[in-house]
UniProtKB/Swiss-Prot annotation:
PANTHER family: ECF RNA POLYMERASE SIGMA FACTOR SIGM, RNA POLYMERASE ECF-TYPE SIGMA FACTO. It is found in: Cytoplasm. Sigma factors are initiation factors that promote the attachment of RNA polymerase to specific initiation sites and are then released. This sigma factor is required for normal cell wall integrity; it is recruited by RNA polymerase to transcribe genes with cell wall-related functions. The keyword DNA-binding applies. It comes from Streptomyces avermitilis (strain ATCC 31267 / DSM 46492 / JCM 5070 / NBRC 14893 / NCIMB 12804 / NRRL 8165 / MA-4680). The lineage of its organism: Bacteria, Bacillati, Actinomycetota, Actinomycetes, Kitasatosporales. GO terms for molecular function: DNA binding; sigma factor activity. This is RNA polymerase sigma-E factor.
């Protein structure tokens, strides 16, 4: 890779690393795994940086690499996932309620299959169109729509199965303690 392309890649990483880390954290539940996922994707992308003709598409390319890498990891392990109470850090300006909602969403996303989680993340968090999501995941637009429909139905079921009244009582208790 030419020196100019190395500098261009370094600048790209410097300016986009926060957004890319957020994308990685939406793909895997553990913050450390998200950092590993992003690092692996950056290493793989670095080797092919000169092959990306339109650098405006670098984010989409990197997301695709992250999704593929996450899928490789998922296939490699024998589903020995151990539930954990550790949740991703929230940004400083998040209110307590927003933090709790984000934590709940991150936890609920764990019930989805990797393909479903990828579709939900790209469509709803990354704000990609159906066609963009289909291209990024290598599937048809119809498959994206049906996968999203099933994933959202599964998320609704999971939300309904949880005791949301208990969560509301906990929130009221926290507010009383804070007052």
């Amino acid at each position: 890779m030419a020196h100019g392309e190395v500098l261009e890649f370094e600048e790209y990483v410097r300016t986009r690393q926060d957004a890319l880390l957020r994308s990685a954290r939406r793909l895997v539940p553990d913050p450390v795994d998200a950092q590993d996922l992003l690092q692996t994707a950056l290493v793989r992308t670095y080797g092919r940086w000169d092959g990306i003709a339109d650098k405006r598409l670098a984010d989409a390319y990197l997301r695709r690499v992250m999704i593929n890498t996450r899928t490789e990891w998922w296939r490699a392990r024998k589903l020995e996932e151990v539930p954990t109470e550790q949740l991703p850090d929230a940004s400083v300006d998040d209110s307590t309620e927003q933090h709790a909602d984000r934590a709940l969403l991150m936890d609920i996303l764990k019930v989805l299959a990797p393909k479903q989680r990828s579709v939900v993340v790209l469509r709803h968090w990354e704000q990609m169109s159906t066609e963009e999501t289909a291209a990024a995941l290598g599937m048809s637009a119809g498959t994206v729509k049906s996968t999203l429909h099933r994933a959202l139905a599964r998320l609704r079921e999971e939300l309904e199965s949880r005791d949301l009244d208990a969560r509301a009582l906990e929130r009221e208790e926290r507010e009383r303690c804070a007052a």
